[in-house]
Design a protein with these regions (language model features):
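A structural "domain/chain start" motif
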Residues: 27-101, 213-215
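Short secondary-structure boundary motifs at beta->alpha junctions and helix caps
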Residues: 87-94, 166-206
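Sec-exported extracytoplasmic/periplasmic mature domains
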Residues: 108, 112-116, 144, 208-215
Length: 215
């Protein structure tokens, strides 16, 4: 008397068990988590008011070189200085725009509003346009900072240089600009972005005041 071969049944049972495990595995895959990263800009939510178009009253032609950042600032993560030689990079708090471009844009806009100025060019400069002065800005601090008193503040410092152009160019002025410390709570990064924007506005005003009224 022949006995049925049990192997096919075992194989079918094994396949069924594997299938059940696969289905169960699909049900226990954790749901995708929301990205916790937040992005910030230096510009506010309000749109700039459009003023009536007027012919410029000034004659100066200014070139704004691309803003340079200390290497540790040249990144998307916002920076918090926690000691004299220690910084913390905020992986989930980032700048939406490159900082050099954002600061250049604000400074250029402020210079265009200065009465002695007729035109402002951003680097790379057009070959067919002469310039009276060039402005260079090296940012050495652009961060939240923890002070020795345990309190946080916004910190911006930059070296600003104004020079003439052409073959015989010379430096007209060179100074270290430090924005007044503004209190920050160390947690609200939207507020830190607002404070640093206010500091950039002060920097832009300083640059405008450094431009001589005549070439």
């Amino acid at each position: 008397m022949s006995h049925p071969n049990p192997r096919p049944r075992r194989i079918r049972a094994l396949c069924a068990a594997i299938g059940l495990l696969a289905i169960a595995g699909c049900n226990v895959v954790p749901p995708a988590q929301e990205d916790a990263t937040r992005y910030f800009v230096l510009s506010g939510a309000e749109l700039p008011a459009l003023a009536a178009v007027q012919a410029p009253t000034g004659t100066l032609r200014i070139g704004v070189k691309t803003v340079r950042l200390e290497s540790y600032l040249n990144r998307k993560e916002m920076v918090v200085r926690t000691g004299a030689n220690e910084v913390r990079f905020e992986d989930y708090r980032r700048w939406a725009d490159p900082l050099d471009a954002a600061v250049t844009r604000i400074v250029r806009s402020r210079l265009l509003a200065a009465p002695p100025v007729a035109q402002v060019f951003a680097e790379p400069f057009p070959f067919d346009q002469a310039r009276d002065f060039d402005v260079s800005i090296d940012i050495v601090r652009f961060e939240g900072a923890l002070g020795a008193d345990g309190k946080y503040s916004a910190s911006l410092a930059a070296v600003v240089e104004v020079s003439t152009t052409g073959a015989g160019s010379r430096i007209v002025s060179r100074k270290l600009f430090e924005a007044p410390a503004q209190a920050w709570d160390g947690e609200d990064f939207n507020r830190l972005a607002q404070l640093l924007r206010a500091d950039v506005d002060l920097l832009a005003q300083e640059v405008a005041s450094d431009i001589p009224e005549k070439p």
